[in-house]
Curated annotation (Swiss-Prot):
This is D-xylonate dehydratase YagF. The keyword Lyase applies. It catalyses: D-xylonate = 2-dehydro-3-deoxy-D-arabinonate + H2O. Keywords: Lyase. Pfam families: ILV_EDD_C (PF24877), ILVD_EDD_N (PF00920). Belongs to the IlvD/Edd family.
Length: 655
């Protein structure tokens, strides 16, 4: 292309440049006290507000900042001018607008700022996944900086939907200890009337490669899986789980998680949230009053009852850290999961695969909380953004018209009984729902691992509730190698796939959903186990062990495994105990203790290395989170610890 094709000829209007303007009409509502005592920035802020078109006579209202993860550019009729990364952030500008109008209607002044977010589905199996988890930390930092950069704000509303943008928003709000804050969940997209959900459809490549899907079927299913333009995926993955956790923390209004994006109830939630945060400000209730150790534990309880994503084992600790609360450890998670029953039957865990919009209609978080209240598993005195406690909110919910009408809507519209989506405890037990998360250890994972035990296919679990698998190892030093082996039909029934180098130092702790989803939706996949130092998408199911620690690149035993080694796995879904052990080879069987000694003698896999395309930004994140406590502390930045380590290093180096 020549420069002439870039700078095309223009008409006279192009050259008619105006060099001055009359400026806004009126005068700033200044007082002598303001001129004498206010910082110049506050005064100039009023000038900027008038310059952007706000009525100069209405510049003394309560300023409320709305932060959001909106992406893309929508035309007035909703058509895309420029696409976003995903449906989850495509429509939330409508919620932000609804909240802003409500603030204005009540005499306030709304401000808005944006930090958009990536799509973990879009980046699965690509180098984009290397930025996924580090993005959460970066976005939380930018959000906090934006909040502090508007020093006149009286309250903050966060609007977000998906896997990393929503946790980042919650972490940012949690750090605003002395401000009223509230979270507006971005809701859920609808499932297609005929077709597949956004989780299963991500396996069209693997199923086509294994001759289980035609090209035409793949093309049609892929086209319609996101059946409405806004909202998070239809399953209870990391996005959906983060929404219910926000509500459980008391940071979002009751019955606000998982609402169908773009619909009247979804918009009204934004307006209600604007009214609520203004009331919090009037009453002097701040984030510090809401995010307590009790709130954190309520969130862990709801996570277990919903059967939530294992990624929240990274996000809830990070929220707790930002809020100044106690960071939950493995023992705390185990204690919660052993006593809290899973009550929700939705995608991807089942046993009935309802989309999350049905969980919303069945009553969502407050309906689950009613059952947990009766079991004595909640802190009912925890404060929430309604200005009332959890217990008071539940009293309202139980007798509300909202509850009755939405549950009836589910019966009439879909022919589904609400208690088949959110099950009473006895019914859940009778249907075989088991507790959510387990932390197996062993000579491969001496510092632990994570499995969503409730999501192991029941057909491969014994009558005693224990999953046993002893099989030969297939070692892969990258996810790309592993998915290629699946597509080339090189994995056979009974294999144990081990993917190493996927921890923080290798890939930024990438998600490996294309592996777990392929194993779920290929007919023989349930007979294969997966072990990795990477993590999993919230929609992952099956005998998949992630977060293996220490990671391979830190010298962890997982990095010393070789093809044709034998691994023995046991996971008790009832007691939530488990083990993952190397037990030698077919020719040289070993006990777990002998296996540990053998692994200690071995060298790390010769092909193991950090990914060639790992960004420097992610390498820095990996180093900072490592000295801050690593994955078991939520991959946080502990500033004091980081400074301590840097100073010690400078001293040792004589800098």
């Amino acid at each position: 292309m020549t420069i002439e094709k870039i700078f095309t000829p223009q008409d006279d209007a192009f050259y008619a440049v105006i060099t001055h303007a009359a400026g806004p009409q009126g005068a700033l509502p200044l007082t002598p006290q303001m001129l004498m005592e206010s910082p110049s920035g506050n005064l100039f802020g009023m000038t900027q507000n008038a310059g952007m078109g706000w009525d100069a006579n209405k510049l003394t209202g309560k300023e409320v900042l709305i932060i959001g993860t909106q992406g893309g550019i929508r035309a007035g009729d909703g058509r895309p001018i420029a696409l976003g990364y995903h449906t989850g952030h495509w429509e939330i500008g409508m919620q932000m607008q609804a909240a802003a109008k409500e603030i204005t209607r009540n005499g306030g002044i709304p401000f808005a700022a944006f930090v958009s977010d990536p799509c973990d589905g879009r980046s699965q199996g690509t180098h984009g996944m290397f930025d996924s988890l580090p993005y959460r930390n970066d976005a939380a930092i930018v959000f906090r900086r934006l909040i502090r950069s508007l020093p006149t704000r009286r309250a903050v509303i966060g609007v977000a939907t998906c896997d990393k943008g929503l946790p980042a928003t919650m972490i940012a709000l949690a750090a605003m200890h002395d401000l009223p804050t509230i979270l507006v969940p971005g809701g859920a997209t609808l499932p297609p009337t005929v077709g597949e959900d956004a989780g299963k459809v991500q396996t069209i490549g693997a199923r086509f490669a294994n001759h289980e899907l035609s090209l035409q079927e793949a093309a049609e299913l892929g086209c319609r899986a996101c059946a409405s333009p806004g909202g998070g995926c239809q399953f209870l993955g990391t996005a959906g789980t983060s929404q219910v956790v926000a509500e459980a923390l008391g940071l979002a209004l009751p019955h606000s998680a998982l609402a169908p994006s773009g619909q009247a109830v979804w918009l009204e939630i934004a307006r209600q949230s604007a009214r609520a945060v203004s009331e919090l400000d009037s009453r002097g209730i701040t984030t510090r009053d809401i995010l307590s150790d009790k709130a954190i534990e309520n969130a862990m309880v709801i996570h277990a009852a919903f059967g939530g994503s294992t990624n929240l084992l990274l996000h809830i600790p990070a929220i707790a850290h930002a809020a100044g609360c106690t960071i939950p450890d493995v023992e705390h998670w185990t204690r919660i999961n052993r006593k809290v029953p899973r009550l929700v039957s939705v995608l991807p865990n089942g046993p009935d695969y309802h989309p999350t919009v049905r969980a919303f209609l069945a009553g969502g978080v407050p309906e689950v909380m009613l059952h947990l209240r009766d079991l004595g598993l909640l802190h009912l005195d925890a404060m929430t953004v309604t200005g009332q406690t959890v217990g008071e909110n539940l009293e309202w919910w139980q007798a509300s018209e909202r509850r009755a009408r939405f549950r009836q809507c589910l019966r009439e519209q879909d022919g589904v009984e609400p208690d088949d989506v959110i099950l009473p405890p006895e019914k859940a037990k009778a249907k075989g729902l088991t507790s959510t998360v387990c932390f197996p250890t062993g000579n491969i994972a001496p510092e632990g691992s994570v499995i969503k035990a409730t999501a192991i296919d029941p057909s491969v679990v014994g009558e005693d509730g224990v999953y046993h698998h002893t099989g030969r190892v297939r070692v892969f030093v990258s996810e790309a190698q592993a998915i290629k082996a699946i597509k080339r039909e090189e994995i056979v029934q009974g294999d144990i796939m081990v993917v190493i180098g996927g921890g923080p130092s290798g890939t930024g702790m990438e998600e490996t959903y294309q592996l777990t989803s392929a194993l779920k939706h290929i007919s023989w996949g349930k007979t294969v186990s997966l072990i990795t130092d990477a993590r999993f998408s919230g929609v992952s199911t099956g005998a998949c062990f992630g977060h293996v620690s220490p990671e391979a690149l830190a010298g962890g035993p997982i990095g010393k495994l070789r093809d044709n080694d034998i691994i023995e796995i046991a996971v008790d879904r009832l007691t939530l105990t488990g083990s993952v052990n190397f037990i030698g080879t077919a020719d040289n069987p070993l006990t777990p203790e002998e296996g540990a000694r053998e692994l200690a003698r071995r060298q790390t896999h010769p092909d193991l290395h950090a990914h060639d395309f790992l960004p420097d930004d992610t390498r820095l994140w990996a180093a900072l989170q490592s000295v801050s406590g690593g994955t078991w502390k939520g991959c946080i930045y502990d500033t004091d610890k980081i400074i301590e380590v840097i100073n010690a290093g400078k001293k040792a180096l004589g800098i």
